[in-house]
Every structure is written in C-alpha cells, then in structure tokens.
Regions:
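Extracellular-facing segments of soluble proteins and assemblies that are Gly/Ser/Thr-biased and enriched
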Residues: 66-118
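Catalytic core of Fe(II)/2-oxoglutarate
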Residues: 175-231
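A general structural signal for short secondary-structure junctions and capping/turn motifs
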Residues: 20-24, 82-85, 118-122, 128, ...
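N-terminal auxiliary "cap/dimerization" subdomain that precedes the catalytic jelly-roll/cupin core
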Residues: 1-87
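Catalytic core of non-heme Fe(II) oxygenases with the double-stranded beta-helix
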Residues: 111-192
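Short, surface-exposed beta-edge/turn micro-motifs
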Residues: 26-29, 124-127, 193-194, 225-226
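Short helix/loop capping segments that flank catalytic or ligand/cofactor-binding pockets
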Residues: 41, 138-140, 207-208
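Short, structured patches in soluble enzyme cores that scaffold and shape functional sites
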Residues: 95-97, 129-132, 140, 201, ...
Length: 231
C-alpha cells in the first residue's frame, strides 16, 4: 500500500520516525520503505519443508548453513527483531508455509486471509514486514464494508446463531470476531504492503483517534513459503 495517493498511509524515512509518529488526521498506517541485502529464498530453502506457520527463534536462524548472501538475509531479519525488542515490542519471525483455515469457520471465515482489523483493550499497534513471498494487503476504510452489515451475511449468521438480533447477538458477533471482518466494495483495489517495507498499523482500541487499518494476509500457494515478521 504505497503511501503515494493513499490518504490513510504516511511514509516515513527512518525507524525512529516510524516508531514516534502518532496516528492522526485519518492516517492509520505508517510505512518505512527500504531495501535489504541478502538471499531470502536461500533461508527458506535451508529451513526445509514444513506445515502451517513455523516460528523461527534466533538460534535456529543463526544455525542455518548459509552462503554469505543467505547470511546477510538472516542477519537483517535478526537485526529487525532486535530493534523491535529494544523498543519493548515482542516480534515473531515466521516461515509461513500455509495459513491454516478453521474447518468450522461457518458463514464468515475469520482467518487472517480475510480482510480484518486487529483489536486490543489498550493502545497497541501491529508491526509487519514481509521479507520473501507474497505480501500482506491493505484496504482503505472507505473501500470496505463490514461483513455483518451486509444483509444476506447478517441473516446467515443470525440463522447460525439461532436467536434474535439483539444485544446478545451483538456480543456473539464480537466473541467470534465477526465484527472485525470486512468485504471490499465493488471496484475496490487492495494495495500491497510490498517486500522489505516495515509497517506500523493502527488497531481497534477504546479511544483510538483513527479507524483501525483493514488488512489481510495473502493466500498461500503450495511450494511458496513466506518469511514474515509480526509484532
């Protein structure tokens, strides 16, 4: 989601600016575009086959038998992790082989490949960086419809719920994260987060000065793992 032409995205030039800039005036995504050295495909190859989402601890990454180019990639990812830890964040570096879908998801899938917002009871942001593979996508709030506001979807969930459309139903929607998922409006174009760009995006929390950033993980294809940093 390049900052160019995106009123909800602000582009920054450094990590310090990314960390310190406050969300305001409708801007709910900050992007530090950059290039990083190294061979990230080699890192994935050395990790070998896997399933689902595999967290990569520092020791495993350092222990990989890599060429100098692969080592540059590994050290760049480890440096990003340490940078976030130094600022009291809890990053996780993952090799995403595939996003596991809930077979009992029901009427509205609520996995990360559906456009959604992140929520928290207190002020907190989501940090994202894709090093290799398909990247996450963002969707302008103006280009999105809350899925539970779409009559046919709401009716289907209400039938699944088996009760009345009242306060208890609203609580049911919240408990199952149905109120966090969105559908693109006709003609809307999702915007890619890109490779190597470090993003800080707004979540939904009480008192937030801006709407949360709507985003999703990409569909994973067999044989195309991703390297993703998230906090």
């Amino acid at each position: 989601m390049s900052a160019a032409g995106q009123p909800r995205v602000h582009q920054v030039r450094s990590f310090e600016e990314l960390r310190a800039t406050r969300f305001a005036d409708g801007v709910n995504a900050l992007c530090w575009e950059r290039t990083l050295p190294g061979d990230y495909a080699e890192v994935i190859a050395k990790l070998g086959p896997g399933e689902g989402i595999v967290p990569l601890d520092d020791e495993r990454v350092r222990a990989l038998d890599l060429t100098p180019a692969g080592r540059l990639a590994a050290e760049a990812m480890l440096a990003d992790q340490q940078l976030l830890r130094d600022h009291d964040l809890a990053p996780s570096l993952n090799c995403v082989y595939d996003c596991v879908r809930d077979p009992d998801a029901g009427t509205v899938p609520t996995d990360v490949t559906s456009f959604h917002v992140d929520s928290a009871p207190v002020e907190v942001d989501t940090w994202l960086c894709t090093y290799h593979g398909a990247c996450s996508e963002g969707l302008r709030n103006e280009d999105a419809l809350l899925k539970v506001s779409i009559p046919e979807i709401r009716t289907a969930i209400l039938k699944q719920y088996g009760g009345k459309d009242d306060a208890d139903f609203a609580e049911y929607l919240h408990e199952h994260s149905y109120d966090s998922h969105y559908a693109p409006k006709p003609g809307a174009t999702p915007c890619p987060f890109g490779t190597f760009a470090l993003w800080r995006i707004a979540t939904r929390w009480p008192g937030s000065p801006v709407p949360p950033c709507i985003h999703r993980a990409p569909e994973n294809h067999p044989g195309s793992p991703r390297l993703l940093l998230i906090s």
